Amino acid sequence: ILIIHYNIKTHFIFKLITKLDINYLFSLVNVVPSNIEANKNINYKKILSLKALARIFSNRIIGFLKRYFQKIKSPNYLLAGGLKSLKSPQASIINNSTKIIWTHTYDFDEYLLNNKKKDNDIIHAIKNNFAVFIDAPSPLIKHDALIPGISSPLTANVYFPSLCKFFDKIEKRLNIEVIIAAHPRSNHLNRPEYFGKRRVFKHMTIDLIKKCKLVINRNSTAINFAVLYSKPIIFHTSKQISNHFSMTHQIYSMANLLDKVPINIDALENIDWNNQLNINKKLYVNYSNQYIKNPKSKNKYLWDIVIREIND
């Protein structure tokens, strides 16, 4: 079972599988929005550097050529999530003999589990009138899970003051408390200064999103939970982010698919805050179908589906 992507760095693994003629399952359940056609209002000339172009060329073009000319063995099974799984460049590794198993993202497993359990005491004690900010690794951890091998453009001394002003605006205009859903890899204390002494909860992201009135996001795929629970989402960007191709691309890809325009936290004038609470239900359903779960796949746990399909 391979949950790694094919690229220049992982080529040797696929080459070894081919040499030893090993049967394998290739996973593409967590495809994220990144289509160029989904992006609007981005100044590509400003942010698309030679380094970014070189990275795209090496991972996609050279990777494809290596697979083609060196005859990399195709997987016996492809584990697919949303309908966009087969549109991913990684899907070019399959052939006509590959059996496609339609399932869903790992987030949907967590969604199924969460719907079966009762609120814990902490969640039960939190008042419903709150917005939840989905924390990300950077800038405290100098990388971002969605941009592997690339340093985050954010610096704590610039990002956090602007973020807190953003939270202040939301709390004042929408009469709502902002609380923090800590990233699993973070080490925040409760009510840290850099979050404006706001409450922080760890390992409770889905619980908080399920109960909140509004989700605040940068480029986290945890918006899957917001989509599944039909929660309004505010996306944000910043001056530092706007000069970084990968992060800008991810934020706008997600936002545009839900008919949202990211708010620049360094320019908070002339914002219709009440409009931020609106959602387009058709786009939410489409997002779920394309990136979370094939509408025809079963509402079963991912590996239960896989085991049954392989055994049939």
Per-segment meaning from a language model:
Residues 9-13, 34-36, 85-89, 141, ...:
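Short, charged/polar "capping" segments at the starts of alpha-helices
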Residues 70-71, 124, 207-209:
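Structural alpha-helical scaffold elements that stabilize or flank donor/cofactor-binding regions
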Residues 102-108, 112-113, 164, 176-229, ...:
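Donor nucleotide-activated moiety binding/catalytic core segment of transferases
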Residues 110-189:
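Conserved catalytic-core segment of nucleotide-activated headgroup transferases in glycan assembly
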